[in-house]
From Swiss-Prot:
Disulfide bonds: none annotated. This is Arginine N-succinyltransferase. Succinyl-CoA binds at L125. Belongs to the arginine N-succinyltransferase family.
């Protein structure tokens, strides 16, 4: 049974295994044990209420409850950019025109931006390639919305998600090679590693401060602005179906898109509802896949089940109740997956 749960100290070796499979470009999941251990400790302190909002971050893992295997990771940063600046580029337009010469040029331009400061961020989404089946990707990504819906007061009005940009299997990023490398004088993998391990001072020190005309970049770099890594395309589709949109903000390293949505307009948050749970044998029939989660802050659990999404009382087996860490009579949160999202 696949279940989402809060990260624990014992997960560090499993997270190292996941980090070794990302192929690069997933800045917040570096293959560095000290960084991952620190990330776990920060998450545990967040749950214990020991950190200011500017440092809070939740980390969850997807676990096979039968074997204890960790199949994926996802996370939420509560408020970005309140300690260290949170940079991206805004893709805008500058117009150069001369009536006398009958010349008019509208030029796509990159503007350095901190516009998302204070937003909550969905991040560190990675599912082991061996587990990319049976709806695990939907569960891993959308479980965060169930947590946010249950504990809405912990998060801010806007939610953003940086999508991994186009990088090949050798770590080559066209956007970085055409822009970032000229200012940072290092390979993409090095910059990505420094950022992922918390060494971010170099960004503020070396970032270009003035607008950049995209026409000065290579054609290859221009083509990947706002585009995602092929492995990230499904994750982008999932978020867009939940209401997230690309508003012309991109990552400063690889040019990948930043998606955003007002938290209360996220479909799964808006349409999820609470209902009582009872123990029994669920009725047979062809029912759609639904997310179900408990309302336990410290022992949060979420999983996928098949049930009538309009039911007034949710029937779960003893094994499902145990996996969700809840009992008959408890309140749980339920929402259907989007109709076109198949889990088989």
């Amino acid at each position: 049974m696949m279940v989402i749960r809060p990260v624990e100290r014992r997960d560090v070796s499993a997270l190292m295994q996941l980090a070794s499979k990302t192929g690069g470009g997933l800045t917040s999941l570096p293959a560095d044990e000290a960084t991952l251990t620190s990330r776990i400790e920060r998450a545990l302190k967040t749950w214990r209420g020991e950190l200011p909002k500017s440092e809070q971050g939740y980390v969850f893992v997807l676990e096979d409850s039968d074997t204890g295997s960790v199949a994926g990771i996802c996370a939420i940063e509560v408020a970005v950019g309140l300690n260290d600046p949170w940079y991206n580029y805004r893709v805008g337009t500058l117009v150069h025109a001369s009536k006398e010469l009958n010349v008019y040029n509208a030029l796509p331009t990159l503007f350095l931006s901190n516009d998302h400061t204070g937003s909550s961020e969905l991040c560190t989404l990675f599912l082991d390639p061996d587990w990319r089946k049976e709806g695990n990707g939907y569960l891993l990504s959308k479980s965060r919305f169930m947590f946010m819906a249950a504990f809405r007061d912990k998060f801010n009005e806007k939610v953003v998600a940086e999508m991994r940009g186009v990088i090949d299997e050798h770590g080559y990023s066209p956007f970085w090679e055409s822009l970032g490398e000229r200012f940072f004088s290092m390979e993409f993998s090095r910059a990505d590693y420094l950022c992922g391990t918390g060494q971010k001072a170099f960004i503020a020190e070396l970032m270009p401060k003035h607008p950049i005309y995209t026409h000065f970049l290579s054609e290859e770099a221009q083509a990947v602005i706002g585009e995602v890594h092929p492995q990230t395309a499904p994750a982008r589709t999932v978020l867009e179906k939940e209401g997230f949109r690309y508003r012309n903000y991109i990552d400063i390293f690889d040019g990948g898109p930043t998606l955003e949505c007002d938290i209360d307009r996220v479909r799964a948050i808006r349409k999820s509802r609470l209902l009582d749970v009872v123990e029994g044998q669920p009725a047979p029939g062809e029912f759609p896949a639904c997310l179900v989660a408990n309302e336990n802050y410290h022992h949060f659990r979420a999983m996928l089940i098949r049930t009538d999404p309009d039911t007034q009382r949710l029937v779960l087996t003893a094994a499902q109740l145990d996996a969700l860490k809840c009992h008959a009579g408890d309140r749980v949160r339920l929402v259907r997956l989007c109709a076109e999202e198949k889990t088989a």
